[in-house]
Amino acid sequence: MFYQIMRSFLFMLNPEKAHDFSIKQLKLTQGTALDFIYRQRVQQRPVQVMGLTFPNSVGLAAGLDKNGECIDAFGAMGFGHIEVGTVTPVAQPGNESPRMFRVLESDGIINRMGFNNEGVENLIKNVKESNFKGVIGINIGKNFSTPVEQGKEDYLLCMDKVYPYADYIAVNISSPNTPGLRSLQYGDALNELLAALKIRQAELQVKYNKYVPIALKIAPDLSDQEIVSIAKSLLEYKIDGLIATNTTLDRDMVKGMSHAGEAGGLSGRPLQNKSTAVIAKFAAQLKGEIPIIGVGGIDNVIAAKEKIQAGASLVQIYSGFIYHGPQLVKNIVNNI
């Protein structure tokens, strides 16, 4: 009920202002007596994925808490894991505003943020200050100014920095808002990146005496042939997990709706069926050897169950959380 009232206020603001206001309030209240506003008990339903024990199967997708400022607040809402980022080696402003739009008719969101973040050092400071007892994933990307051909170096630099503080590392090569980034999903470019990441992972495992799994985050806009090729590479390089999927460039499901013509990635309910279909296709190729984290359009228990049935071991929410609030976390955790 409280969130419904809060939402009516937030939705009077433009989406990015609403986001920034929310982050600011959560940051102020987390760890204080005021966190009763959003703190809730959820059932303990531990699940083992990527060699980690997750308190439950519902996580916060990357992009909502880019700089890791509100980890404890989101933890208080019952998330079993929180994926912060996407973070880049150095701070960058992202694309020009306006860059986030609500597709209200279908509970969708279009964004072209462009990896706006305060840089990896700032994120690490926030992660170190967190008291969250669940799993923290750190989602890494490349800077806008780094040529795609040299993108591998940005990922390795971020990996070096975050490795001691992450429970898992998510490698984002699928945002549609950084020019050329999605080209890293294919062929030799993907194989070179995965090979370099695995070599560095082995070196860092020795250095820190701990193994931090790597999960690759992919786009939903893939042909069947591309899915087969990516799955083959994941298996060949023994990548620890797959996050499926990021936002879509497809607009078929929101034709004629508000802001449908805006450039950027579409998320929320319109993405549900497309992302679930991609998960099912990857599951058929990976045959249980690599776990899948399902994300895209989950805004109710049924949608979450569909992701699990398609082959996901965990689910993440973002847009559904914007539209439905913390109660969505509790509903899914307790009923999935």
From Swiss-Prot:
Substrate binds at K66, N111, R112, M113, G114, F115, N172, N177, N246, T247. Belongs to the dihydroorotate dehydrogenase family. Type 2 subfamily. It catalyses: (S)-dihydroorotate + a quinone = orotate + a quinol. GO terms for molecular function: dihydroorotate dehydrogenase (quinone) activity. Keywords: Cell membrane, Flavoprotein, FMN, Membrane, Oxidoreductase, Pyrimidine biosynthesis. Its EC number is 1.3.5.2. The lineage of its organism: Bacteria, Pseudomonadati, Pseudomonadota, Gammaproteobacteria, Alteromonadales. The gene is pyrD. CDD domains: DHOD_2_like. InterPro entries: Aldolase_TIM, DHO_dehydrogenase, Dihydroorotate_DH_1_2, Dihydroorotate_DH_2, Dihydroorotate_DH_cat, Dihydroorotate_DH_CS. Its cofactor is FMN. This is Dihydroorotate dehydrogenase (quinone). Monomer. Catalyzes the conversion of dihydroorotate to orotate with quinone as electron acceptor. Pathway: Pyrimidine metabolism; UMP biosynthesis via de novo pathway; orotate from (S)-dihydroorotate (quinone route): step 1/1. GO terms for biological process: 'de novo' pyrimidine nucleobase biosynthetic process; 'de novo' UMP biosynthetic process. The active site is at S175.
